[in-house]
Amino acid sequence: HMAWDHHGNRLRYCRSLQPFSLELSDEMPMTGQHESSVTYPEFYRMPDGQLLFFYRDGSSGNGNLIINSYNSADKKWTGIQDNLISGEGKRNAYWQACVDLNGAIHISWVWRESPDVASNHDLCYAVSKDGGRTWEKSTGEKYRIPVTQNSAEIICSIPQRSELINQTSMYVDGKGKILIAAYWKGLGNLPQYQLVYHTGKQWKQADLAFRKTTFSLSGQGTKKIPVSRPQVIAW
């Protein structure tokens, strides 16, 4: 399965004609719905072999999270969430997902209020234990779909203009403990790498506090900044 060339573009998707083959089909739709403005496409393989496809429908500061599911028997995609996290026409969620060993899907995200990167704020969380159909908070409280700014579980409160980067990194270990890496203004009022993690009972934050150089994420478009997004590597 391939999806490519997306930043507010129509869906461009194809798949191989045979398993493991590099001979690809023509471009085709998935469900035919919400496919005119696709950004950040990601495939996730579930432990049972199910394939999920996540993407943003809409634009920076105004978009929703879509999830499709692929049935390998009839080779068809169906939509399981056509608006999981709603920006309500006012904002969008910059999300990252992780599938744990038990097949639970974890999503964390920050909100952005406008195309200005400085409008990023708050780190939020949701988890699904049934393949993406129903979602809940880390407390077990069920979400009403779509999740909105007012209903989202905020696991770390971060105000706008904190140099908060969107699309961070997340990992869930074999015991279900969650680790999220990001950066925003920390100690010394400088952008610092931050860890947000769940102990099994509560969320905690660690400011790594080793950076000495300041910078700003204010404004639109791609930024020339002195750090990269963090990645979590586990073994």
Predicted regions and their residues:
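Extracellular, repeat-based ectodomains that mediate carbohydrate processing or recognition
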Residues: 1-235
